[in-house]
Amino acid sequence: MSDIAARVKKIVVEHLNVDEDKVVDSASFIDDLGADSLDTVELVMAFEEEFGIEIPDDAAETIQTFGDATKFISEAQ
């Protein structure tokens, strides 16, 4: 697992209080990990802070899974 993926996973586990084993590339924040819309906004803000990037609103709407988040952040770095 890349450093970025490990850091994203840590944020997801801490913010959503889920088991690390459930955080896989295809895991939907809402459908699989129990997040609501506020949780997803907080995740995006945490990603921005952790990685020193800005995620525009239109891009944030496309980040639905752990894999989406990791891919977006990797490309934004």
Curated annotation (Swiss-Prot):
InterPro entries: ACP, ACP-like_sf, PKS_PP-bd, PP-bd_ACP, Ppantetheine_attach_site. Keywords: Cytoplasm, Fatty acid biosynthesis, Fatty acid metabolism, Lipid biosynthesis, Lipid metabolism, Phosphopantetheine, Phosphoprotein. Residues 2-77 form the Carrier domain. It comes from Jannaschia sp. (strain CCS1). Pathway: Lipid metabolism; fatty acid biosynthesis. GO terms for molecular function: acyl binding; acyl carrier activity; phosphopantetheine binding. It comes from the Bacteria. Signal peptide: none annotated. NCBIfam families: acyl_carrier, PRK00982.1-2, PRK00982.1-3, PRK00982.1-4, PRK00982.1-5. GO terms for cellular component: cytosol; membrane. GO terms for biological process: lipid A biosynthetic process. Carrier of the growing fatty acid chain in fatty acid biosynthesis. The lineage of its organism: Bacteria, Pseudomonadati, Pseudomonadota, Alphaproteobacteria, Rhodobacterales. It is found in: Cytoplasm. HAMAP family: Acyl_carrier. This is Acyl carrier protein. SMART domains: PKS_PP. PANTHER family: ACYL CARRIER PROTEIN, CARRIER DOMAIN-CONTAINING PROTEIN. Pfam families: PP-binding. Belongs to the acyl carrier protein (ACP) family.
